[in-house]
């Protein structure tokens, strides 16, 4: 087997536009695992959102990576092997920046997600992710975080597609090098502590399974997947990926055409 570990993004890579996962991809994952390969999903989603979807893939053991690499959990037990997050002062600063500009913002702990706005965009988010968001009313998100002493894992802003990159640049300029600003879709901007990108997942799995990075493959579609793919030995991008990711990876079929299955065949040396 050429690559003994295979890390895959979820939305836009495994999950098609209609929210489903193809049987071809499911079969390819099962075959790769049956041959001795370790397959792990690495997503920006929270654990409560991704764990139920793993059952669709027939994955009932192993590890799953959530929150852009900040959290690693045991699939069978839900036990946390890694759970990093913000210093509270940093989380408050980021939330104040977003709320001062009137953005639709989310703040995540390892178990829950809170939002400052109840609207159609939030309803759509809940449907896609399969989670119930806690609406904060009568106070700012930053005030709730401070009052309850929340340990924040991730902060997100929902935006119109044409506002995504401008907000990313604004946050990068305002926050500096101590934070990681990225995007996981055309309407989401996400902020993590510096060093908590999906590249951290490659390093974690390499150490956990005692497999060198040269024998780890990764695939994705969005800018938040670039660090993971760049860190891996086998670099893949689905055909619908962002140009920045395609530039550093071997491009396979799109998510709608079972690109993950194609990459898994290559990873297995077929």
Regions found by a protein language model. Name each.
Residues 36-40, 60-62, 154, 214-215, ...:
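Short active-site oxyanion
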Residues 57-60, 67-68, 175-177, 231-232, ...:
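Short, structured coil segments at secondary-structure junctions
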Residues 25, 50-54, 167, 171, ...:
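Hydrophobic packing residues within well-ordered alpha-helices of enzyme cores
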Residues 23-125:
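Active-site phosphate-binding/coordination module
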Residues 1-5, 22, 190-270:
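Mg2+-dependent phosphoryl-transfer enzymes with acidic/Ser/Thr/Gly-rich catalytic loops
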Residues 19-36, 83-91, 138-139, 195-207, ...:
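Short, acidic loop-to-helix structural element flanking the phosphoryl-transfer center
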Residues 2-18, 94, 229:
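Asp-based phosphoryl-transfer active-site loop
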Residues 97, 101-104, 108-219, 223, ...:
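Conserved acidic, metal-coordinating active-site core of Asp-based
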